[in-house]
From Swiss-Prot:
Site, Stabilizes the basic form of H active site to accept a proton: residue positions: 99
GO CC, alphabetical: cytoplasm
GO molecular function: peptidyl-tRNA hydrolase activity; tRNA binding
Record protein name field: Peptidyl-tRNA hydrolase
């Protein structure tokens, strides 16, 4: 029987050296949610830091798990699939938060299904769940210079930090990402897309 819990997974890479990098937008947004809803993380089978709590919004209450995979980005699917199988959470009750180079810094787009857009964490989750039909909060980080060394530029870009201006805007951006995850759960995908995708 499917659980009535939701699973929110913020993607990133574990370890100090990745802490404030663009690729860790998901982790950082998960931390905002953890603070808002008093989530205490504990280890889940060595695959993720996982906590659970309850959200109370608009007179409704929703139980949820919050996960930060420890598998490194490219194997995020192992963690997400393990949690969803263990707690019987269906893909339509999963929200994944991740960085997205196709969007400028500060922009958020919400979607379910469709292409992974070259994001290895999303490709891994699609593979492990056997479907792309879960909700995604795409957090814009802009993109590196194209050109001869495009792959290396991309790797250096996503594993790089934020400039001073972006760092100033980051708290508000992360709060918006957390709002988007909550809105998907409480108001559904279409309404959340209307609110965020046109900004």
């Amino acid at each position: 029987m499917a659980s009535d819990f939701w699973l929110i997974a913020g993607l990133g890479n574990p370890g100090k050296k990745y802490e404030d990098t663009r690729h860790n937008m998901g982790f950082m947004t998960a931390d905002v949610l953890a603070e808002r809803w008093t989530v205490n993380f504990a280890d889940h089978k060595g695959l993720a830091m996982l906590g659970k709590s309850v959200m109370n919004l608009d007179g409704r209450t929703v139980k949820f798990f919050l996960a930060k995979p420890l598998t490194y980005m490219n194997d995020s699917g192992n963690a997400v699939a393990s949690i969803s199988a263990y707690y019987q959470i269906e893909p339509d009750h999963i929200v994944v938060i991740h960085d997205d180079m196709d969007l400028e810094f500060g922009r958020i787009k919400v979607k379910a299904g469709g292409s992974a857009g070259g994001h290895n964490g999303i490709k891994s989750i699609d593979r492990s769940l056997g479907t792309p039909k879960y909700a995604r909060v795409r957090m814009g980080v802009g993109h590196s210079k194209r050109g001869a060394n495009a792959h290396d530029n991309t790797v250096n870009w996503v594993l790089g930090g934020f400039g001073p201006d972006q760092r100033k805007q980051l708290p508000e951006f992360l709060a918006d990402g957390a709002d988007a995850a909550e809105d998907i759960i409480f108001h559904g995908l279409a309404k959340t897309q209307e609110k965020f995708n046109g900004r």
